[in-house]
């Protein structure tokens, strides 16, 4: 299975980089995991809703340029569907069973994702109603992907 995580912005904090590298290493026995960073668009401190949409649109074009037609795409979104770790693990397993060997996860920038990115999504996924930095979301997401593979392999990691 090939898993790609497309994220807006560059990860700067070493502790986040270290955590992600650790989970990538752990996942390597189950899947090839690629992380693709696209540049974030600079926005003024105070901006209008139209400027907000323009930033999301520009970032959205950058995201969409990294997604292939055959990929099954999850977009992280507050309004997405929440599921348990077990439900998520079953979805990942089912995708592989039914021929989706390329799965892409999208984490938008601080303003979220554009309508075009959300329309391209096969599924909108939420990790709760809490707001968190998108850099931290990368760690949460990759850990949950790892947890899904561990659940599917029958490992006691999830207990």
From Swiss-Prot:
SUPFAM superfamilies assigned: alpha/beta knot
Coiled-coil region(s) at which residues?
none
Q: Which GO terms describe its molecular function?
A: rRNA (pseudouridine-N3-)-methyltransferase activity
Location(s), subcellular: Cytoplasm
What's the superkingdom here? Bacteria
Source organism (scientific name): Lactobacillus acidophilus (strain ATCC 700396 / NCK56 / N2 / NCFM)
Q: What does this protein do?
A: Specifically methylates the pseudouridine at position 1915 (m3Psi1915) in 23S rRNA.
- Keywords, ordered alphabetically: Cytoplasm, Methyltransferase, rRNA processing, S-adenosyl-L-methionine, Transferase
Q: What is this protein called?
A: Ribosomal RNA large subunit methyltransferase H
Q: Which sites bind S-adenosyl-L-methionine?
A: 108, 127-132
NCBIfam families on file: PRK00103.1-3, tRNA_RlmH_YbeA
Q: Which InterPro entries match?
A: Alpha/beta_knot_MTases, RlmH-like, tRNA_m1G_MTases_N
Gene Ontology CC: one annotated term: cytoplasm
């Amino acid at each position: 299975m090939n898993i790609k995580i497309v994220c807006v912005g560059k990860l700067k904090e070493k502790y986040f980089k270290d955590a992600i590298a650790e989970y990538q290493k752990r996942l390597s026995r189950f899947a090839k995991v690629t992380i693709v960073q696209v540049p974030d668009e600079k926005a003024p401190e105070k901006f209008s809703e139209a400027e907000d949409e323009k930033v999301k649109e520009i970032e959205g074009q950058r995201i969409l340029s990294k997604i292939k037609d055959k990929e099954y795409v999850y977009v992280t979104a507050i309004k997405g569907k929440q599921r348990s770790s077990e439900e998520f693990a079953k979805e990942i397993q089912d995708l592989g069973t039914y021929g989706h060997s390329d799965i892409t996860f999208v984490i938008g920038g601080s303003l979220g994702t554009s309508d075009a990115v959300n329309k391209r999504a096969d599924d909108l996924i939420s990790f709760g109603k809490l707001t968190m930095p998108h850099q931290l979301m990368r760690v949460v997401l990759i850990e949950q992907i790892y947890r899904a593979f561990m659940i599917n392999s029958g490992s006691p990691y999830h207990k």
